[in-house]
UniProtKB/Swiss-Prot annotation:
Protein name per UniProt: UDP-N-acetylglucosamine--N-acetylmuramyl-(pentapeptide) pyrophosphoryl-undecaprenol N-acetylglucosamine transferase
Chief localization: membrane
Positions that bind UDP-N-acetyl-alpha-D-glucosamine: T11, A12, G13, N125, R162, S196, Q288
Keywords: Cell cycle, Cell division, Cell membrane, Cell shape, Cell wall biogenesis/degradation, Glycosyltransferase, Membrane, Peptidoglycan synthesis, Transferase
InterPro entries in the cross-refs: GlcNAc_MurG, Glyco_trans_28_C, GlycoTrans_28_N
Enzyme Commission number, as recorded: 2.4.1.227
Listed HAMAP family: MurG (MF_00033)
Family: Belongs to the glycosyltransferase 28 family. MurG subfamily.
Keyword Cell membrane carried by entry: yes
GO MF, one annotated term: UDP-N-acetyl-D-glucosamine:N-acetylmuramoyl-L-alanyl-D-glutamyl-meso-2,6-diaminopimelyl-D-alanyl-D-alanine-diphosphoundecaprenol 4-beta-N-acetylglucosaminlytransferase activity
Species this protein is from: Leifsonia xyli subsp. xyli (strain CTCB07)
Gene3D superfamilies linked: Glycogen Phosphorylase B (3.40.50.2000)
Length: 358
């Protein structure tokens, strides 16, 4: 029996690819032992046990970014976490550590190095995080979701997708999707989503132009997320949801989308051939703009800054684009040309390579 330690978490961007790879490992070898390392505060604390995997936790330990009391405590706390993970590796007979970034990842990478256990990394963002930059120094087996990601030994594997997305047959799922959302079969669908946390700029701008979008012959499936600040105007062909737990069905209908440029969103859209306007999150290290660069360069998406995504931009840019059905169809083909549906298989193949070289 082979035992794997999958390390990472914090956000859905780390947890979902981790779970996709865990599922693939378990499918390929039902006897395999898959243990997940995370923190008690991250999303993994809920999602990992719900999926049937054992979760081991270590303290949430952000890398210090300024000289303060936390920075003084960090080296000792980091060493304690590395020792705890090392003990776990020895006690459970871990054959390989597979990391996906997040707070639990870096101590796992250091522990794998000390234990001389094969380490395999997956970096989901085009601009790698601190944990991946550290871990990539310790291993030649580094998979990345985006071409051109600057990490040593990086090889393009795409994003491990949720099974319901990886296996989605959009044509076959369309009748169920139309029924789920109460939408019309004879209109193209514009999917609008800011993710689970929402995106105020996207929500406000689309709501301000809902009438014009529907008058242009489209129907709008608007998933506002977050705190649900918008009220449903009751317009025909405009469906406003606070949250959607069937994103597979939403994507089955999407002929075009407006969204943030998170790694998972981009990779799911590209894998399914959904063209989009991407409005990167305006705060942070600019990783969402980097994420979108490849699909935009391929012609499968349009990039607009958060501050520029205004009703006037919709009038001048989005509405004419949606009116050009040939361009929308071409953008769909170009998005699909950079999409990857077998990211889970590619990461598992990388794990097998690491094991065989050990």
């Amino acid at each position: 029996m082979t035992a794997y330690l999958l390390a990472g978490g914090g956000t859905a961007g780390h947890v979902n690819p981790l779970l996709a790879v865990a599922d693939r490992l378990r499918r390929d070898d039902p006897a395999a032992e898959v243990l997940v390392l995370g923190t008690a505060e991250g999303l993994e604390a809920r999602l990992v046990p719900a999926r049937g995997y054992e979760l081991a936790t270590i303290p949430r330990l952000p890398f210090p970014r300024r000289p303060n009391a936390a920075a003084v405590r960090f080296p000792g706390e980091y060493r304690r976490s590395v020792r705890a993970v090392g003990e776990l590796i020895r006690a459970r007979g871990i054959a390989a550590v597979v990391g996906f970034g997040g707070y639990a990842a870096a101590p796992a990478y250091s522990a794998a190095r000390k234990a001389a256990v094969p380490l395999i990394l997956h970096e989901a963002n085009a601009r790698p995080g601190l944990a991946s930059r550290l871990g990539a120094r310790y291993t030649p087996w580094v998979g990345v979701a985006f071409e051109g990601t600057r990490l040593p030994h990086a090889r393009f594997v795409g994003m491990p997708l949720r099974p319901e997305i990886e296996e989605l047959d959009r044509v076959a799922a369309r009748p169920a999707a139309l029924a789920e959302f109460g939408l019309a079969a004879d209109r193209p669908t514009l999917l609008v989503t800011g993710g689970s946390l929402g995106a105020r700029r996207i929500n406000q701008t689309i709501a301000a132009r809902a009438v014009r979008l529907t008058e242009a012959g489209w129907q709008v499936l608007h998933i506002q997320g977050g705190r649900g600040e918008l009220s449903d105007p009751g317009l025909p062909h405009y469906r406003l949801l606070g949250y959607c737990d069937r994103m597979d069905l939403a994507l089955a209908l999407a002929d075009f989308a407006v969204a943030r440029a998170g790694a998972a969103t981009l990779c799911e859209f590209a894998a399914l051939g959904v063209p989009a306007v991407y409005v990167p999150f305006p705060i942070g290290n600019g990783e969402q703009r980097h994420n979108a660069a490849g699909v935009v360069a391929a012609g499968g998406g349009v990039l607009v800054d958060d501050a520029g995504f205004l009703p006037a931009w919709v009038d001048a840019q989005l509405l004419p684009l949606l009116a050009d059905r040939a361009r929308v169809a071409e953008m769909a083909e170009r998005a699909a040309s950079v999409g990857v549906r077998d990211g889970s298989d590619r990461v598992v193949a990388l794990i097998r390579t690491g094991l065989s070289a050990a």
